[in-house]
C-alpha cells in the first residue's frame, strides 16, 4: 500500500509509521519538520504545515496514496485544510475519548454520564474544552475532536477514539508519576486503587496498521 500519514513523527503517529514500514508499505509523512526522528526508518517526507498542503497538491497526486492516516488533527480546520488535496481513499483518524459526555464530568467533578463507557455513549454537549482555560502545551484553544470527526465523516473515515495512552516518546509524560519515584530510589510507591485502563503506544500503533 501507499500510505499518506498526516503528522506522524511523534508518539502514536511515529509508531504507526514504523509499523507501516516494517510491513513493507510505501509511506509519505506530511509534517512540519520540527520533530523528525534522527535516525529513523527510511520513509518519504513532505515538510509543510498541513494548512498549506494545497501548495503541494502535485506531490500528493504523484505519490497516489491508497490509504490515509490522520495522526494529528486537533481542530476542524486542520481537516478542512487537507480535504481538497487528499484523495478519497480508506482513511483512519486518531480521535480521543474526550468526545464523550463523561469527559465533561471528569473535568467538572460531576457525574454527567454513566460509566464505564461504550462506543455509543452520549457525546459531549459542550464544545472546546480548553477555550479560555489554558489547556495542555501545544493544544490550541479551538481544539475539538468532535469537529475533527465531523469533518472526516463525509469521507467515511474510520475514527478511533483512543483512551489514555503511554509509551516511548510521550510528550505528556504520563508515566512520569512512577518514573520520578524510581529515579529517586524509591522502593515503595503507595498509590490508590487502580481505576484506569491504559494502552501502550506500541500496541495502539499496531492496531492502526
Predicted regions span which residues?
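Conserved beta-loop-beta element that borders a ligand/cofactor-binding pocket
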Residues: 95, 146-169
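NAD(P)H-binding glycine-rich loop region in Rossmannoid oxidoreductase-like domains
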Residues: 34-93, 99-105
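Conserved Rossmann-fold NAD(P)-dependent oxidoreductase catalytic core, especially the SDR/UDP-sugar
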Residues: 80-146, 158
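Conserved small/polar residues in nucleotide/adenosyl-binding loops
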Residues: 204-209
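Conserved glycine-rich Rossmann-like NAD(P)H-binding loop of the short-chain dehydrogenase/reductase
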Residues: 26-32
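N-terminal Rossmann NAD(P)H-binding glycine-rich loop of SDR-like oxidoreductase domains
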Residues: 3-23
Amino acid at each position: 500500500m501507499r500510505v499518506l500519514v498526516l503528522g506522524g513523527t511523534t508518539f502514536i503517529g511515529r509508531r504507526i509509521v514504523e509499523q507501516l514500514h516494517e510491513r513493507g508499505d510505501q509511506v509519505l509523512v506530511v509534517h512540519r519538520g520540527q520533530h523528525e526522528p534522527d535516525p529513523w526508518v527510511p520513509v518519504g517526507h513532505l515538510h509543510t504545515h498541513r494548512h498549506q498542503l494545497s501548495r503541494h497538491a502535485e506531490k500528493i497526486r504523484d505519490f497516489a496514496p491508497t490509504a490515509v492516516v490522520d495522526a494529528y488533527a486537533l481542530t476542524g480546520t486542520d481537516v478542512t485544510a487537507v480535504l481538497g488535496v487528499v484523495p478519497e481513499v480508506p482513511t483512519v483518524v486518531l480521535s480521543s475519548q474526550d468526545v464523550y459526555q463523561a469527559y465533561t464530568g471528569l473535568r467538572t467533578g460531576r457525574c454527567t454520564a454513566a460509566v464505564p463507557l461504550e462506543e455509543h455513549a452520549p457525546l459531549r454537549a459542550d464544545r472546546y474544552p480548553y477555550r479560555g482555560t489554558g489547556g495542555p502545551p501545544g493544544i490550541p484553544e479551538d481544539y475539538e475532536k468532535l469537529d475533527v470527526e465531523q469533518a472526516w465523516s463525509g469521507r467515511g473515515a474510520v475514527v478511533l477514539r483512543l483512551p489514555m495512552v503511554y509509551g516511548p516518546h510521550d510528550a505528556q509524560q504520563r508515566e512520569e508519576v512512577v518514573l520520578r519515584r524510581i529515579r529517586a530510589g524509591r522502593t515503595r510507591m503507595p498509590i490508590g486503587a487502580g481505576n484506569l485502563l491504559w494502552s501502550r503506544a506500541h500496541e495502539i500503533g499496531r492496531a492502526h496498521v
